[in-house]
Amino acid sequence: MKASLLNKLDILQDRFEELTALLGDAEVISDQSRFRAYSREYAEVEPVIVAYRQLCKVQQDLEGAQALLKDSDPDMREMAEEEVAEAKAQLETLEANLQRMLLPKDPNDGRNVFLEIRAGTGGDEAAIFAGDLFRMYSRYAEKQGWRVEILSESEGEHGGYKEVISRVEGDNVYAKLKFESGAHRVQRVPETESQGRIHTSACTVAVLPEPDEQAAVEINPAELRIDTYRSSGAGGQHVNKTDSAIRITHLPTGIVVECQEERSQHKNRAKAMAWLAAKLQDRQDAAAHKEISETRKLLVGSGDRSERIRTYNFPQGRVTDHRVNLTLYSLNEVIGGAVEQVIEPLLQEYQADQLAALGD
């Protein structure tokens, strides 16, 4: 392992011991905010230190076994050769795991997200496909133990959605979904197509991390136009009695968000403001993403929403992710919610990209 990485591990070990002492300090325990922050950091560092200590132990075992290779007893030498081979294999695995653990962490990985799906080219077929994508992500979320709530929806005339905006809440949501942003294309024969011709339609998906605190994104109330209207969403007869739906326009950028799913105008406003904060944060981050992409071309994670990232070909039962040249013939499984079949290879490719940068 590189000296620079070993040095980083030594620094982390010192920090781990410091955190252990801090979490036992009465003054820290009485301050819940500090205690939670240190506890989170401890939970992040602990697995790295456990693996590092295991690596150090295996390194010592290897050195001991190598010393026995000089023994005059042939049986001892044979046993030592086996131990050396075993220790080297363990070291290789441990070093690879530690390198992954030391990869730069995306501060957004643990956050909830706003998932925006919009029908693009293809008319009714695009709207139907948007509905398919929303069901796909909803089923995947259910398997992950996440919660999905629709904030705003505009249904298509023949099913699906012209647009559907949802909030996905759970553990490491952004970490799993962040590479889903982009243009998704579908190729299939519409039910209304009498000649059996394959039509191509498209939808765009945007995955925005929810900021921890809206205070992190400065929003001047004077720059907002807030409109109320009667909801056409859930809520039964109640929605006909009050203007509970909220539409917020951020005048400097022209960004518009709306929420109509709650009966309470106050709740709709709070959710719309959180969504607006996420969109403004995303806008601020876009320039940084562009700079990174131009400096070093990334196969995965460029963040370009206009980029065609995936094709779903129904006649062939094929899903192709164009960023990593991945083709699977399990379309029904993927569209049925097994998106991990595509997500996991993308994450692996991204990690490989980071590891290559770590070695530069």
Curated annotation (Swiss-Prot):
InterPro entries assigned: PCRF, Pep_chain_release_fac_I, Pep_chain_release_fac_I_sf, Prokaryotic/Mito_RF, RF-1
Protein's cellular compartments: Cytoplasm
Claim: Protein biosynthesis is one of the keywords in the record: yes
Main location: cytoplasm
Annotated Gene Ontology cellular component terms: cytoplasm
SMART domains: PCRF
PTM: Methylated by PrmC. Methylation increases the termination efficiency of RF1.
Pfam family, one: PCRF
Chain positions with N5-methylglutamine modification: Q237
GO MF term list: translation release factor activity, codon specific
SUPFAM superfamilies according to UniProt: Release factor
Keywords of this entry: Cytoplasm, Methylation, Protein biosynthesis
Family: Belongs to the prokaryotic/mitochondrial release factor family.
Biological function: Peptide chain release factor 1 directs the termination of translation in response to the peptide chain termination codons UAG and UAA.
HAMAP family to which the protein is assigned, alphabetical: Rel_fac_1
Protein name per its UniProtKB record: Peptide chain release factor 1
Protein source organism: Stutzerimonas stutzeri (strain A1501)
Gene transcribed to yield this protein: prfA
